[in-house]
Every structure is written in structure tokens, then in C-alpha cells.
Amino acid sequence: MGIGYIIGCLFSILLWRLDRQRIFNFISVKSKDKIKNVYVVQFLYLFLIFVIYLGLAFIKNNQVYNAITAFIVIDISNTERENLKNNEKKHFYDTISTISRALICGFITPLFLIVMFGNGLAIVFTILYNLSADEDLNILGFIVSIANIIPSIMAEVFLYIIYVFRNRNLKIKFKGDYISNLFIVPLLNVDILAAFIESVNFYSYHNGNNMHYLKSYGDYNNKIDNVCIKDYLSISYSICFLVFIAFLVIQLI
């Protein structure tokens, strides 16, 4: 049964103010101060993470281990709540991405990995995800993006259904970028769907052909404000609830 996962999830929600990324950011800063080559740093991280995974493989599954795993990997960040206090437009755009990232990386992907591969790989993903917040660690970021592909599609299915019922429209304009986003920046497609649901524009920076440019997605019918952000946040929590129920059902089968 999934009682251990339920307890771990509840503790994670109760301790939502615990900023895991601040801990990993401290580790990353100290490591880069000692070792100047970021590729060497990433190699050492991957080696240590592999050792951790081997150690976790020897732990027998039980409800205590399940509870600890759920507490570690489920991380609905408090960052978006903090950003609600800031009314600058830039912060609202950041907040949409933060909510999407928390939904995928802090919830759906870890649970997906538990179902498919067990607790150990979910913990490994969480470590990689938090370390990859440092954009210099591009290899770790690439691994995290690959792991997010299928979970992103799962979230997009929920978001698309909500979009269709709310807007009475089947068409989403990804401007020909859906496939490239899916394999390079899978979370961007989630952000785009969120923009269409809330009827706002979402801007993304792109690099290509020696050019840096800004691309706009969504519909400019509303401005991004507290109401929009709170609505998307509630949608995100609803998806988390449905995914967790499905996860528990799978555990019972």
C-alpha cells in the first residue's frame, strides 16, 4: 500500500517553506570555488550520485523508505507564492515558469520515476534537478530535461483538456516549435499551454543562427497579474492531486 508515500507527501506539504534549492546552491557555489572547471565539477557530481544510487539499490522497500522518498522528491516550491508579493511584470512571467517547473520537476517526474524504476532513481532525479538550477551545470540540466519529456506530456494532456473546456477551442499555436521544445526545453510547452489557458502572452528567449531573440506565445487578451497566477497555481495543485491519486491506485494494483 501507499501509506508511506502519503505520509511523506503530507510532511513535504507541511514543510513547504523548506528551500531545498538553497541547500544545493550552497553546495554548488562551494564546489565551484574549489574546482574551477565546471565539467570536472559535473563529473564528480555524477560519480557521487551514481554511488548514492548504488547504495539506495540495497535498501529494501518499506513504508518508512517510501515516506522518506516522498518527502525528499515531492517539492512544491514556495517561490511562486513569494513572487505573488511582487507586482513587477518580469516576476509574473518568472512565476508561470516556476509553477510549471514545480509541477513537473517537483511532483510528476519523481512519481513517474518511482512507478517505472523505483525510489532510488526518483531521489537521484531530485538531486540532479536541484543541482541543475545552476545554469553552468549544463550536462546535469540536459539529463533533467530528458527525464522531464514524458512527465511534461502527461501535464500537457491535463492542461490541454482544461484549455478546451475553458476556451471552447481545440487549436494551440506552438508556432512550429512543439517538437523541438519537447526534446530541448520540455517545460516550455507547459508554459505555453498555461499562457493559452490564462489568455496571456508568454515570452521566451531563443538562441539560434548566431542570434538572440524573443518569441511570444499565447493570446494577449489578459495581462499577467495576481489573478492569473493564482488561477494557474490552483490548476497546478489540482493536477498534482489527480496525479497523486493515480499514483496511489497504481501502488495498490
Give the residues covered by each predicted segment:
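Hydrophobic N-terminal alpha-helices or hydrophobic patches in metabolic proteins across all domains
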Residues: 1-253
